[in-house]
């Protein structure tokens, strides 16, 4: 999965997919009542990027729906996964469940079109704080009470705080999550970070009793760091330059071993050689 980083304006969806992304990451900010408000990152952000592009969240979802609904004039067949980077740092811990409920209702209405031929992409809810694990239950509860529990089949999870792998496993246990787990690891492209924790996450993914289904590394902008991440066995790389990742995947060393994921590749299934 080539994951376009910080896609917060509707026009950027086309831009990143046309560069080779089959997945995008979008920032979601919340207001003081835990309503998802804007697709917005703010400063500071990655080096070489504009940090301040934004859209009202529900409007962005409508644009995203068009980009992932077959038959729509804006449809991109290869855009198959969306990671919502949930900026829950502005919320109190006891608002996490409410944030999940409100997020689910926004998605149900504006992205899934109330279950009637909405967008088809798989969705990852990426949560920065382990203490906010109740967001997951709130999300599920809202979809169930609105009569669409089947949409949970399209939803996965990520705790993005680079916490100890054991602590992350524990948070999922408390959240009642078994499966659909992506594990991120990374740091802004302005700084360097080793691959030690990525290797631990990959080892957990490949063990018989691990909780992780997929591992992605961020933010990967250079050819060499792409090669290093692929050599470590990641399933996805988040990048500001999807064309760089696509180029490396075309190199003979990687062509035989990796391919770009399509809609038929289940993002919740651990890949077995």
UniProtKB/Swiss-Prot annotation:
| Active-site positions on this chain | 5, 41
Binding sites annotated in the UniProt record for Mg(2+):
25, 27, 85
Cofactor names: Mg(2+)
Q: What is this protein called?
A: Dermonecrotic toxin LarSicTox-alphaIB1aiv
Gene3D superfamilies in UniProt: Phosphatidylinositol (PI) phosphodiesterase (3.20.20.190)
Q: Which residues are glycosylated?
A: 250
Please give the GO cellular component terms listed in this UniProt entry: extracellular region
Cofactor binding note: Binds 1 Mg(2+) ion per subunit.
Q: Where in the cell is it found?
A: Secreted
- State what this protein does: Dermonecrotic toxins cleave the phosphodiester linkage between the phosphate and headgroup of certain phospholipids (sphingolipid and lysolipid substrates), forming an alcohol (often choline) and a cyclic phosphate. This toxin acts on sphingomyelin (SM). It may also act on ceramide phosphoethanolamine (CPE), lysophosphatidylcholine (LPC) and lysophosphatidylethanolamine (LPE), but not on lysophosphatidylserine (LPS), and lysophosphatidylglycerol (LPG). It acts by transphosphatidylation, releasing exclusively cyclic phosphate products as second products.
UniProt record similarity statement: Belongs to the arthropod phospholipase D family. Class II subfamily.
Among InterPro entries, the record links this protein to: PLC-like_Pdiesterase_TIM-brl
Please describe the organ and tissue distribution of this protein's expression. Expressed by the venom gland.
Native organism: Loxosceles arizonica
Citing just one GO molecular function, the answer is: lyase activity
Which Enzyme Commission numbers does its entry carry?
A: 4.6.1.-
Query: Can you list the disulfide-bonded cysteine pairs?
Result: 45-51, 47-190
Q: What is its main location?
A: secreted
| Top-rank taxon, per record | Eukaryota
Which keywords fit this entry according to its UniProt record?
A: Cytolysis, Dermonecrotic toxin, Disulfide bond, Glycoprotein, Hemolysis, Lipid degradation, Lipid metabolism, Lyase, Magnesium, Metal-binding, Secreted, Toxin
Q: Give the GO biological process terms.
A: killing of cells of another organism; lipid catabolic process
Q: What is this enzyme's catalytic activity, as reactions?
A: an N-(acyl)-sphingosylphosphocholine = an N-(acyl)-sphingosyl-1,3-cyclic phosphate + choline; an N-(acyl)-sphingosylphosphoethanolamine = an N-(acyl)-sphingosyl-1,3-cyclic phosphate + ethanolamine; a 1-acyl-sn-glycero-3-phosphocholine = a 1-acyl-sn-glycero-2,3-cyclic phosphate + choline; a 1-acyl-sn-glycero-3-phosphoethanolamine = a 1-acyl-sn-glycero-2,3-cyclic phosphate + ethanolamine
């Amino acid at each position: 999965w080539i994951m376009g980083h910080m896609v917060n304006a509707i026009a950027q969806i086309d831009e990143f997919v046309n560069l080779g992304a089959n997945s995008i990451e979008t920032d979601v900010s919340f207001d003081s009542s835990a309503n998802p408000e804007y697709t917005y990152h703010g400063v500071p952000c990655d080096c070489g990027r504009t940090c301040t592009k934004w859209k009202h969240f529900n409007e962005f979802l409508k644009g995203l729906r068009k980009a992932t609904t077959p038959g729509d004039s804006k449809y991109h067949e290869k855009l198959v996964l969306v990671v919502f980077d949930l900026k829950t740092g502005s919320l109190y811990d006891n608002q996490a469940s409410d944030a999940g409920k409100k997020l689910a209702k926004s998605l149900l209405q504006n992205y899934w079109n109330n279950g009637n031929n909405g967008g088809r992409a798989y969705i990852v809810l990426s949560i920065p704080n382990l203490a906010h694990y109740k967001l997951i239950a709130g999300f599920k509860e809202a979809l169930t009470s609105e009569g669409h529990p089947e949409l949970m089949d399209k939803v996965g999870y990520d705790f993005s705080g680079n916490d100890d792998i054991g602590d992350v496993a524990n948070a999922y246990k408390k959240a009642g999550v078994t499966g659909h787990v992506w594990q991120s690891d990374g740091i802004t492209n302005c700084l360097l970070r080793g691959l030690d924790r990525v290797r631990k996450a990959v080892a957990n993914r490949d063990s018989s009793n691990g909780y992780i289904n997929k591992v992605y590394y961020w933010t990967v902008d250079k050819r060499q760091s792409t090669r290093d991440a692929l050599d470590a066995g990641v399933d996805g790389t988040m990048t500001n330059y999807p064309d760089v990742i696509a180029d490396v995947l075309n190199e003979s060393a990687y062509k035989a071993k990796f391919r770009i994921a399509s809609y038929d590749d289940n993002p919740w299934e651990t890949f077995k050689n």
